[in-house]
C-alpha cells in the first residue's frame, strides 16, 4: 500500500493494519495515528520509535514483555501472532532438534530471569545459527545495555514489518 492510503485510513483501520508492528502493542499504533499525515516509511517509523523512546522504563520493559519467547512454548501451540509465526518459521526455529531446542529454552529462561523480559532478536536480519550465540553473548550484558539492545531489536522488527506493509524494501 502507498503512503496516501495510510494517510487516508480511519482510526480503526489504521489500528487493525498497524496494531502489531510493535508486537501485541496496538496502543502504540493508536497513538501514532494522530501524527498523520506521514511523508513515507521513515516518517511513519519515526513516530513509532518516538513513542517507545518516550515511555518510562516500566513501559519500555512492557513493550519487550509483549514479545514471545523465541522457539518457546507458544511456538508449538500456535499461540504466536501471524507476524511472529512467519518470522520464527523463516528463521528455522521450528526446525530445532530436541537437544538444540532444550539448550535454547534453557538460555531463554536464564535471560528472562536475568532481565525480566524475553530475548528479542530481529530474526529476518540474523543467521538462524547465530541466534543461540547472540543469546549467550547478550546474557552477559549489563541490564541497562541489554534493555537498549532489546529495544533496538524491537525497532528493527517494526521497520521490517512496516516496510512489508508498505511494499517497500527494508
Curated annotation (Swiss-Prot):
Record gene name: URAD
GO cellular component: peroxisome
Cellular compartment(s): Peroxisome
Protein name (record): 2-oxo-4-hydroxy-4-carboxy-5-ureidoimidazoline decarboxylase
Active site: 67
Listed NCBIfam families: UHCUDC (TIGR03164)
Organism of derivation: Bos taurus
This protein's UniProt keywords: Decarboxylase, Lyase, Peroxisome, Purine metabolism
Enzyme Commission designation: 4.1.1.97
Family: Belongs to the OHCU decarboxylase family.
GO terms for MF: 2-oxo-4-hydroxy-4-carboxy-5-ureidoimidazoline decarboxylase activity
Involved pathway(s): Purine metabolism; urate degradation; (S)-allantoin from urate: step 3/3
Amino acid at each position: 500500500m502507498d503512503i496516501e492510503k495510510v494517510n487516508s485510513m480511519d482510526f480503526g483501520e489504521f489500528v487493525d493494519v498497524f496494531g502489531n508492528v510493535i508486537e501485541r502493542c496496538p496502543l502504540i499504533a493508536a497513538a501514532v495515528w494522530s501524527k498523520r499525515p506521514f511523508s513515507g516509511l521513515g516518517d511513519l517509523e519515526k513516530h513509532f520509535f518516538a513513542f517507545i523512546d518516550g515511555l518510562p522504563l516500566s513501559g519500555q520493559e512492557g513493550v519487550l514483555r509483549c514479545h514471545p519467547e523465541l522457539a518457546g512454548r507458544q511456538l508449538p501451540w500456535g499461540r504466536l501472532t501471524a507476524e511472529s509465526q512467519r518470522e520464527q518459521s523463516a528463521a528455522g526455529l521450528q526446525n530445532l532438534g530436541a537437544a538444540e531446542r532444550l539448550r535454547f529454552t534453557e538460555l531463554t529462561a536464564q535471560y528472562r530471569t536475568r532481565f525480566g523480559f524475553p530475548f528479542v532478536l530481529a530474526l529476518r536480519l540474523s543467521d538462524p545459527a547465530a541466534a543461540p550465540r547472540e543469546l549467550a553473548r547478550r546474557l552477559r550484558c549489563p541490564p541497562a545495555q541489554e534493555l537498549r539492545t532489546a529495544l533496538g531489536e524491537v525497532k528493527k522488527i517494526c521497520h521490517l514489518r512496516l516496510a512489508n506493509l508498505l511494499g517497500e524494501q527494508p
